[in-house]
């Protein structure tokens, strides 16, 4: 019942079954293949690339020895040196402009966040004040209702003691209608 080895050499391990070569035709298929390869061994760590570092230009030299230009007096090789220096300086200036633009946008974004947060707090405070006002009105209405009930109860109790004497006289009357009799 052992698996037969084609090479039949002792001590040689069996080869893994080779996966058929699949060429991705669409980006979605390529992503699916990558995910399948990752999920074959979920214990293995997945490679996550780090964010590339931002390019920084070289600082301009503090002291320039050979100041030259693209004038006719320069030698044939000097023009190329000048051209490279000029290109490097333009790159540095472009970088500084982009950096200042990015900082400006960041500042505007932070200001807008602060402004939005302040507006939200103002709206919340206004609504909170309105809720508190309604709550106070309800409490005052409830207190007024309780006081009016107390006054009515006190009036009823004083009027009920006066009307008790009248009720005794009313009880003495003979009812004109009695249920159950015909």
Swiss-Prot record:
Could you tell me where the Basic residues compositional bias lies? 125-143
Which Gene Ontology cellular component terms are annotated? nucleolus; spliceosomal complex
Localization recorded for this chain is: Nucleus; Nucleus, Nucleolus
Q: Where are the transmembrane segments?
A: none
Q: Where is this region: Disordered?
A: 1-80, 114-182
One GO term under biological process is: RNA splicing
Work out whether the entry's keyword set contains Nucleus.
yes
What molecular function terms (GO) are annotated for this protein? double-stranded RNA binding; protein kinase binding; protein kinase inhibitor activity
Q: Which domain of life is it from?
A: Eukaryota
Q: Where is the composition biased (Basic and acidic residues)?
A: 1-18, 27-43, 114-124, 144-156
Q: Which family does it belong to?
A: Belongs to the PRKRIP1 family.
Sorted alphabetically, which PANTHER family does this protein's record hold? PRKR-INTERACTING PROTEIN 1 (PTHR13507:SF0)
Assembly, in brief, is: Component of the pre-catalytic and post-catalytic spliceosome complexes.
User: What is the protein's given name?
Assistant: PRKR-interacting protein 1 homolog
Recorded name of the encoding gene: prkrip1
């Amino acid at each position: 019942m052992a698996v037969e080895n084609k090479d039949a050499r002792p001590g040689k391990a069996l080869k893994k079954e080779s996966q058929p070569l699949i060429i991705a035709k669409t980006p979605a298929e390529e992503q699916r293949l990558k995910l399948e390869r990752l999920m074959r061994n979920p214990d293995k760590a997945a490679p996550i690339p780090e964010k590339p570092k931002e390019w920084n230009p070289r600082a301009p030299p503090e002291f320039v020895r050979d100041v030259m230009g693209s004038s006719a007096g320069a030698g044939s090789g000097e023009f190329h040196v000048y051209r490279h220096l000029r290109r490097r300086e333009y790159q540095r200036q472009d970088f500084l402009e982009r950096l200042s633009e990015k900082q400006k946008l960041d500042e505007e974004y932070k200001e807008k966040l602060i402004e939005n947060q302040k507006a939200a707090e103002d709206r919340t405070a206004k609504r909170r004040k309105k809720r508190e006002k309604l709550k106070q009105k309800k409490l005052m209405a409830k207190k007024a209702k309780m006081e009016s009930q107390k006054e009515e109860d006190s009036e009823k109790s004083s009027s009920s003691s006066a009307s008790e004497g009248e009720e005794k006289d009313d009880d003495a009357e003979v009812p004109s209608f009695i249920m159950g009799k015909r």
